[in-house]
Amino acid sequence: FQAEDGIRDQPRSRGLGDVYKRQAVSFVLAGTGVPVAKHGNYSATSKSGAANVLKSLSVNIDCGIDMVQKSLDNVGICFLLAPKHHSAMKYVGKIRQEIGIRTVFNLLGPLSNPALVKKQLLGVYDKSLILPFAESLKTLGSTHAWIVHGSDGLDEVTITGKTYCAELKNGLIREFSINPSDIDIPSAKLTDIIGGEPEENAKEINELFNGKKSTFRNVVILNSASALVATGHANSLEEGAGKSIISLDSGEALRKLEELIKITNS
């Protein structure tokens, strides 16, 4: 099993429950034609993990490898539940939940996508991890990647202010930063972009895909644009934002969600 492009589930950031935005981004990317191999788990240190949100969206996340491959081949997006594809993970999940704080697994998880994707956007929960992760991805064979950390502490591209970034491309690493104003997206407060329980997050994703204009839409567009640049499917944030908006407004992102629900439950 292998996918050329992908956006992975990142380490939790302060337990703020922000992971649901990345689920929306995955479907937006798939709606632009980028194959997406999501790798994630149930929440261990935050309100809502990738698996929690997708389950609330009615996606069957307990699929075997054959169905995962079929989803990627036929829909353009798949989800790999960590305990099913890394057998050791199922023995530590309960312990991680009981501990309730970040552990080494928050660092190992983003580096262990079973799809072996070579291009990705990856968020880290501390600015000091940006370069070490870039070096690690280089060693693991990634060809193009962005590693990001929001100045507000989020492990994603933020719209509250600056996002610190490192780009790995052709074996070279460069550092830079981006701001929402770079593509004319208004800034927002941190409280405006933090998610809640899985059901709430799923509801907001469905509303987004059905045309709701909101701060959530803005942060999804900025993260999707960044992911398109990071995977070589856009040459600039402006181009990436344009493709992301088309994916949302044309209904392609929603169609990808509906197709994934259908195929994983067939």
Describe these PLM feature segments.
Residues R8, A37-S43, F105-L108:
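Core alpha/beta catalytic barrel or barrel-like domain that forms the active/cofactor pocket
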Residues F1-Y20:
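Single conserved hydrophobic/aromatic residue that forms the stacking wall/gate
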Residues G33, K55-D62, M67-S266:
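Glycine-rich anion-binding loops and their surrounding alpha/beta cores
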Residues R14, N41-S46, H85, S151-D152:
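Acidic, glycine-rich active-site loops and adjacent beta-strand->loop/helix elements
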Residues D18-S71:
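A generic, well-ordered mixed alpha/beta core segment in the N-terminal half of proteins
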Residues I7, V19-K21, V28, V36, ...:
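Hydrophobic aliphatic residue packing
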Residues S13-R14, D18, V36-N41, F209-T215:
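A short glycine/serine-rich beta->alpha loop
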